[in-house]
């Protein structure tokens, strides 16, 4: 591609007039065109000054030489073939251009008078041209392309559609950023409005009820890259009228262009259409007649066939079938009529002369039935009275009435454990990841459950009880299910709260029933989740206080606990039953339950490390449709302390985001959005900062992010690199910077240079504000400054990393334990009590000394950060503009900007860009998703600008 110097060395330039509808392309005279006059060529171009470089390989001959016989691959020929022109082609004959018809007439040479006339006319034209030297003739694109082959810049808008002033106004109203009415009033009050452009209102009312405006603001002295001077505004009709009355500054109203047309009305009906319609009607009539004739013929044949078939069937039925079936039909009818006559005679004999009714009456009177019914009357009266009384009593019972009987009481006292025969929990050790230590500890239990006879022969007593403790969501219940699933034994699962009821003795009865079922089906596993609800520390242990020993609820809970202690290690301890308990509050359990013999193993289930988190993410990712471009290892390393349940929620949340965005699979952006939703919060749609507020937030966050990249690039710092920078409000934050976490060893053994580099990163937000805005800083970086102050204090007082080392002896606050459990009852006293969390220093002058040394350290690091950012001011401004445009950028984009805008890059190169907020860069994960590794084309070459 030609360089920028070659571009400005050409004699071709473009001048853009004020009228955007038409523009003039001026072609200056050069060495090869010295004998020609200045020419003009009108072409529709827009206001924007983008140019397209038409580059090709020229021949070995010089630019001043011409080629009378162009090759087949000539540039002009190829361009004209690919872009055929609507202008009639012309041919050069001598110094004159002729079209095809004129050239043919010229070649004939039959008319001598015409030739003489043309000769005299050429002489006269050449003489006039030499006298005035200012005559103009047409210059065609083919001539220009041949003359400046390979060195011509043509605006790409030449080949685009021509827009009128009204259409360009509508396009700007749609594309430009929107300005609210309040912001316009503020700008109007501060005299910042340069021009207000609107469109003329016609007599027709607006259908949408809105009116558009283009607002041109005055340029404010300062950094131009952070100022936007052109805005669009869309107001209702009433607001627009009020605003125009209030605004008294410069205005420009675009006139509506009305076109009229006068011509002859088209003939109706059209003669061609009329002839076509008549022909179609004739053809349809002929087709209809043919179809009717065919129907008559075919119908006659079908009628004849039907008549023949029906005649044959009638003759066959009358003369063949009926004579054969007639004797059999007479026989069946005679038998049926005889049976019917006999039955009717019997019915008449029974019902005549009293018949059966007289016999029933004699039996009721003389058989003793009447006397028996007389005796049942008082008995039936008593029974009916009792039934009515019970029914009335039941109708008056409360809604929460429950029937109590012996059988229901027995069923109520049963454990109702959720039993799974043959360990059908559906969970194996292969489904458990991230807690390898706990799985290794529990392998012995699985071996015992699979082969208990082997342990009995060797006299080995297996662990009777195992307590699983750890934070919520780390997999305690999952491990218990995996034990039963691996061993294939009955698994009984209950919660600690299921043993608590209103009736006395129900809890202990359920404990006995639970262990009885497990002993019958041994070997088996009993699992009680949240056992702290059942086995809380009993009252009065290790204390003399016994105020609640005679509380009924306390006695019931302690009775249930005593029954559990007996079942675990009493006189009748069941062999072959493994008891598992899970809790996240071990400090609340009774000491008698924790002693050896009851809970022989106490396994701590901790949150998974980076490798465990990666394994958990892979297990859950295998259950959903996830793109291959998603890097799960980055999430595993950047989410320390996350439990397995939270990682599972992350994958499910990412799947929901992918469905919400109509993606075919879970992409990297979906995972990032899910992480932000779970860590920071959902996007706050109702909160939208103004342009100045977004600039401040973007400057602060970019300053922090780009400082880390600069330190990694030029000082080889061992600090975190930036993953993402976002100015989208989420949760309680307006913006955020996400860093890539290092390995655990970097945080366990931090060195002084590493901590000082982190201090510079925290000070990068305020330093970036000073570089861009000067002394006009804000409190946008107050959170980073507070963290920087605390880090500087820890470097000096807690870690004692000052050189030379000075031991201050100030204990860190996290090593001080409070002297209370739970909130204080006296609220007023708790306002002024620090609960021994703050201790006086060893040296009374230590506070002043630490404050002075911290201030010196922060000031030193701040000056270094400001100097580093000033050297890379162009890259800083470019990153801020890109972040304002895209709202979120990646660390790869920051590296891309630093590569193309090295230190000491002139700021004018950025200001001369047509769109500084764009970036010709595609992140790596998007390239993997699309499978295309080609960068996006851009109208401005970044390398050429630099």
From Swiss-Prot:
Signal peptide as annotated in the record: none
Targeting signal (transit peptide) range: 1-54
Quaternary structure, from the entry: Oligomer.
Function, as annotated: Functions in chloroplast biogenesis and chloroplast division. Required for plastid development during embryogenesis. Might be involved in chaperone functions or play a structural role in the thylakoid FtsH complex.
UniProt family annotation: In the N-terminal section; belongs to the AAA ATPase family. In the C-terminal section; belongs to the peptidase M41 family.
SUPFAM superfamilies linked: FtsH protease domain-like, P-loop containing nucleoside triphosphate hydrolases
Location of the protein in the cell: Plastid, Chloroplast inner membrane
Keywords: ATP-binding, Chloroplast, Hydrolase, Membrane, Nucleotide-binding, Plastid, Plastid inner membrane, Protease, Transit peptide, Transmembrane, Transmembrane helix
SMART domains referenced in this protein's UniProt entry, alphabetically: AAA
Assigned GO CC terms: chloroplast; chloroplast envelope; chloroplast inner membrane; cytosol; plastid; Ycf2/FtsHi complex
Protein's UniProt keywords contain Hydrolase: yes
Residues the record lists as binding ATP: 470-477
Membrane topology: Multi-pass membrane protein
Matching Gene3D superfamilies: 1.10.8.60, P-loop containing nucleotide triphosphate hydrolases, Peptidase M41
Phenotypic consequence of gene deletion: Embryo defective.
InterPro entries on file: AAA+_ATPase (IPR003593), AAA_lid_3 (IPR041569), ATPase_AAA_core (IPR003959), P-loop_NTPase (IPR027417), Peptidase_M41 (IPR000642), Peptidase_M41-like (IPR037219)
A GO term, aspect molecular function: ATP hydrolysis activity
PANTHER family, A to Z: INACTIVE ATP-DEPENDENT ZINC METALLOPROTEASE FTSHI 1, CHLOROPLASTIC-RELATED, METALLOPROTEASE M41 FTSH
Protein's organism: Arabidopsis thaliana
Protein name per UniProt: Probable inactive ATP-dependent zinc metalloprotease FTSHI 1, chloroplastic
Transmembrane segments: 289-309, 320-340, 369-389
GO biological process, one term: proteolysis
């Amino acid at each position: 591609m030609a360089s920028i110097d070659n571009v400005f060395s050409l004699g071709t330039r473009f001048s853009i007039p004020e009228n955007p509808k038409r523009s003039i392309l001026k072609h200056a005279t050069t060495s090869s065109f010295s004998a020609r006059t200045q020419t003009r060529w009108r072409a529709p171009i827009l206001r924007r000054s983008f140019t397209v470089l038409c580059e090709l390989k020229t021949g070995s001959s010089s630019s001043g030489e011409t080629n009378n016989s162009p090759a087949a691959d000539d540039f002009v020929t190829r361009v004209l073939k690919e872009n055929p022109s609507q202008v009639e082609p012309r041919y050069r004959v001598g110094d004159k251009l002729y079209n095809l018809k004129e050239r043919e007439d010229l070649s004939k040479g039959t008319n001598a008078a015409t030739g003489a006339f043309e000769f005299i006319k050429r002489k006269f034209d050449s003489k006039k041209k030499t006298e005035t030297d200012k005559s103009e003739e047409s210059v065609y694109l083919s001539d220009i392309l041949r003359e400046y082959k390979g060195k011509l810049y043509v605006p790409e808008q030449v080949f685009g559609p021509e827009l009128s002033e009204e259409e360009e106004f509508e396009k700007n109203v749609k594309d430009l950023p929107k300005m609210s009415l309040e912001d316009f009033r503020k700008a109007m009050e501060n005299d910042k409005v340069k021009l207000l452009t609107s469109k003329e209102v016609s007599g027709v009312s607006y259908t949408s009820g809105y009116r558009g405006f283009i607002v041109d603001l005055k340029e404010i002295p300062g950094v131009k890259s952070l100022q936007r001077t052109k805005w669009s505004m869309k107001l209702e009709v009433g607001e627009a009228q009020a605003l125009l009355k209030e605004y008294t500054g410069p205005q420009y109203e675009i006139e509506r262009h009305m076109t009229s047309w006068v011509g002859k009305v088209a003939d109706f009906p059209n003669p061609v259409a009329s002839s076509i319609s008549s022909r179609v009607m004739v053809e349809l009539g002929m087709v209809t007649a043919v179809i009717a004739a065919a129907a008559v013929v075919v119908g006659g044949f079908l009628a004849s066939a039907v008549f023949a078939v029906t005649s044959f069937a009638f003759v066959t039925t009358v003369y063949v079938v009926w004579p054969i079936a007639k004797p059999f039909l007479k026989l069946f009818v005679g038998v049926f009529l005889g049976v019917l006559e006999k039955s009717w005679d019997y019915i008449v004999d029974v019902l005549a002369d009293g018949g059966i009714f007289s016999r029933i009456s004699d039996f009721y009177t003389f058989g003793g039935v009447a006397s028996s019914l007389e005796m049942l009357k008082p008995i039936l009266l008593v029974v009916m009275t009792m039934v009515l009384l019970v029914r009335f009593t039941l109708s008056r019972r409360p809604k929460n009435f429950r029937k109590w009987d012996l059988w229901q009481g027995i069923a109520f006292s049963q454990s109702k454990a959720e039993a799974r025969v043959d360990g059908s929990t559906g969970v194996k050790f292969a489904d458990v990841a991230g807690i390898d230590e706990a799985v290794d500890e529990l392998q012995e239990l699985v071996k015992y459950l699979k082969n208990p006879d082997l342990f009995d022969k060797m006299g080995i007593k297996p662990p009777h009880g195992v307590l699983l403790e750890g934070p919520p969501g780390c997999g305690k219940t999952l491990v218990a299910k995996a034990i039963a699933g691996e061993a294939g034994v009955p698994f009984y699962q209950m919660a600690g709260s299921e043993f608590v009821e209103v009736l006395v003795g129900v809890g202990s009865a359920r404990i006995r029933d639970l262990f009885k079922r497990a002993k019958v089906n041994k070997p088996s596993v009993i699992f009680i989740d949240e056992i702290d609800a059942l086995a809380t520390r009993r009252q009065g242990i290790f204390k003399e206080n016994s105020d609640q020993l005679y509380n009924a609820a306390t006695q019931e809970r302690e009775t249930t606990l005593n029954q559990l202690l007996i079942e675990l290690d009493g006189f009748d301890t069941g062999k072959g039953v493994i008891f598992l308990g899970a809790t996240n509050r071990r400090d609340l359990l009774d000491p008698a339950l924790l002693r050896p013999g009851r809970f022989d193993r106490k396994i701590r289930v901790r949150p998974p490390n980076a490798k465990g988190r990666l394994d958990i993410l892979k297990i859950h990712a295998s259950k959903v449709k996830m793109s291959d471009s998603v890097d799960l290892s980055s999430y595993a390393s950047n989410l320390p302390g996350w439990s397995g349940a939270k990682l599972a929620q992350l994958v499910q949340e990412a799947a929901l985001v992918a469905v919400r965005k109509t993606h075919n699979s879970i992409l990297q952006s979906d995972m990032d959005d899910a992480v932000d939703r779970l860590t920071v919060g959902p996007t706050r749609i109702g909160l939208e900062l103004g342009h100045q507020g977004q600039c401040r937030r973007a400057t602060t966050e970019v300053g922090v992010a780009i400082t880390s990249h600069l330190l990694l690039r030029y000082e080889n710092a061992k600090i975190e690199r930036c993953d993402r920078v976002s100015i989208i409000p989420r949760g309680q934050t307006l913006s955020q910077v996400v860093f890539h976490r290092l390995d655990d060893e970097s945080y366990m053994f931090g060195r002084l240079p590493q901590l000082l580099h982190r201090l510079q990163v925290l000070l990068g937000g305020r330093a970036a504000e000073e570089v861009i805005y000067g002394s006009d800083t804000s409190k946008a970086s107050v959170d980073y400054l507070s963290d920087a102050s605390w880090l500087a204090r820890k470097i000096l007082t807690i870690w004692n990393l000052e050189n030379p080392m000075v031991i201050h002896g100030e204990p860190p606050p996290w090593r001080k334990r409070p002297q209370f459990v739970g909130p204080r009852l006296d609220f007023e006293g708790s306002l002024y009590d620090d609960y021994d969390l703050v201790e006086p220093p060893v040296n009374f002058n230590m506070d002043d000394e630490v404050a002075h040394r911290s201030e010196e350290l922060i000031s030193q690091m701040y000056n270094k950060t400001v100097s580093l950012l000033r050297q890379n001011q162009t890259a800083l401004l470019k990153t801020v503009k890109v972040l304002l445009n895209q709202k979120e950028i990646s660390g790869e984009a920051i590296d891309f900007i630093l590569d193309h805008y090295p230190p000491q890059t002139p700021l004018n190169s950025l200001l001369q860009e047509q769109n500084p907020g764009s970036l010709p860069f595609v992140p790596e994960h998007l390239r993997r998703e699309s499978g295309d590794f080609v960068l996006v084309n851009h109208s401005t070459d970044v390398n050429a600008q630099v």
